[in-house]
């Protein structure tokens, strides 16, 4: 079914991939935080744990009472979450607590985390909860227990979210240790976690000098209030398995019926990311063609007979554009994305997908070879056309608009900026005496200042006045824009050095509800 490539060469097929201590990574960490500090930080934010979840019926014990924060406070008060003391407390409790009770408790805490990340965003706390789980639950149940497999995968996901890759891998090694012959269990989530941990399918960890340069340039062009929403990704060491081991896994997933029947869009998106990481572009193209009937020559075909048909989603298309972008082929990537949109018009593409697409189009844009910015323009128009096709207005997204503004500023294209204001901001702001869209307002002010400054620099003062009259969102905004226009057209006497400083930062020095934000 699949042609040979460097990935699918002629290779032996022993056991899938066994646990090994060689899967190790180091991570750059901040100053150590004690468990007690972490717990106190959490608990100080909570006055009453019952405000988080209200039980619907009487409960049998504290761990399953649907008040996980209250239970966490109790354990911290009794044992400070020390593994031996907590395990002993649970084991000999008068409530006769079971491993299942602790599993419920941990999953309730994870649910709290998913709803309010800042509340439980403490690695030390989760590390203690995991080690308690390992002793109180894993050691007490049989190998291959479905509950344990699910929970351990949840711990892996948690430590990935907390940027603790070594600990996530340690948890996964426990999964392999408890599985038959040390093989990866035939379980979708476990396979997906393996792809993330060991096969490069965490594109957010693809930090290169190119990506760091991109973020530094972006922050430089968006200095001020809006720059706070942009962060240079911290570097995390991310060693992955070699090509031969990846070959082995891929053949299992594609050709072994026991594994191929598990395919879903999440697994496909991770496989595509992994292929991008390993720079297997020929096989990447082949994979998309066989399983989705798409290729970069704008050819749309039926998927291969007998292959499980899946409808792509935002996550899968994010992986496609990231894989192509990572291999310096963003133009082909956007062509493939366009073919996906044509073949699968029922897809629901969310803002995170468009954010990723705009990001890669800018990151791979060479302003010296492509002075017109054809790649960023194509990505932007692709988004506009998509929303027009489905009959929806373009939704506001802070990062997308800041990416876009940095591009327009580099080209001094105020006409495109005016169109953006009409297409994106018009539906958000209603002219009132006091508009309260804070984040949107910050970005709109940046657009307004850029447009006004550019028009003044081109002696288009009449157009500038028209723009101010049309796009003032309230009295305060209008008064500020008029004052800014007067400053530009009637400059005060100042030194050349001071003028330079003002030019660098005045795009983001504006009032918000009477306050100067810097």
From Swiss-Prot:
Where does the record say the transit peptide is?
1-15
* UniProt-annotated location(s): Mitochondrion
Chief site of localization: mitochondrion
Alphabetically, the GO molecular function entries are: RNA binding
Against Pfam families, the record matches this protein to: ATP13
Q: Which InterPro entries match?
A: ATPase_expression_mit
**Any coiled-coil regions, as ranges:** none
Q: Is Signal included in the keywords of this UniProt record?
A: no
> What Gene Ontology cellular component terms go with this record?
mitochondrion
Biological process annotations from GO: regulation of translation
For this UniProt record, give its keywords in alphabetical order, as a comma-separated list: Mitochondrion, RNA-binding, Transit peptide, Translation regulation
Chain's role: Required for translation of the mitochondrial OLI1 transcript coding for the mitochondrial ATP synthase subunit 9.
So what family is this one in? Answer: Belongs to the AEP2 family.
Quaternary state and interactors: Binds to the 5'UTR of the OLI1 mRNA.
User: What is the designated name of this protein?
Assistant: ATPase expression protein 2, mitochondrial
Question: What organism is this sequence from?
Answer: Kluyveromyces lactis (strain ATCC 8585 / CBS 2359 / DSM 70799 / NBRC 1267 / NRRL Y-1140 / WM37) (Yeast)
